[in-house]
Amino acid sequence: CHCIAVREKLLAMKETLGIPEFGGPWFCTTLRPGEVTVNMTRTAGNAIDNRNFTAAECRLREDVFKIARIFKENFEEFKNSYVTTVAVHAGIRETRRIKGVHTITAEEYVNAYKYPDSISRGAHPIDIHVAAGAEQSVTFLKKAAYVPYRALIAEDFSNLLVAGRCISADKTSFASLRVQASCMGVGQAAGVAAAQCIKAGVTVQKADIHNLIEELKKLGAII
């Protein structure tokens, strides 16, 4: 859950206590009584530069323990808290994407435009985080959006199919498509398409869309 009261108190103390950049915070319970996960740390960086990304990860790990101390000292609910686990690596919201045969636009995504080659759906809010500060823009979708097969095909390559955060989408639609559920749906479609193309002896540009969609439906994909 997103705790607004905690957020407001943190923002009020940010300058005085030197609180690192943060988002949320969002809290989730686990299977262990009294344990919560805290989704909060945030930093800007260039994740395609290994040195820059390494520096960002080091900074974030330091921030975890700074924030843990601030919670322990300033929130009654956390007075006996301690850190048990830190994420293996930093989550990356955005790096490079392909220029596909079709690029999903914000207008198409928000209005749930159904393409003739739709192979997956996206329902996560359009969630844009600022590079610096605690703000974010959130737009909830009225209807689950669609993802076309063409957005998985790289425009300038004869036989390249991608999935996950690399698909062809503008910045706004990508802010929803980047999450795990969307990546799983697109990944399933890409895998089935690749298998069918190999069996048929054709490139990914020549995939039989009807057969692809029918097979995905048989597998229980949400289309």
Which residues fall in each region the model found?
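Flavin (FAD/FMN)-binding glycine-rich loop and adjacent Rossmann-like elements that form
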Residues: C1-I223
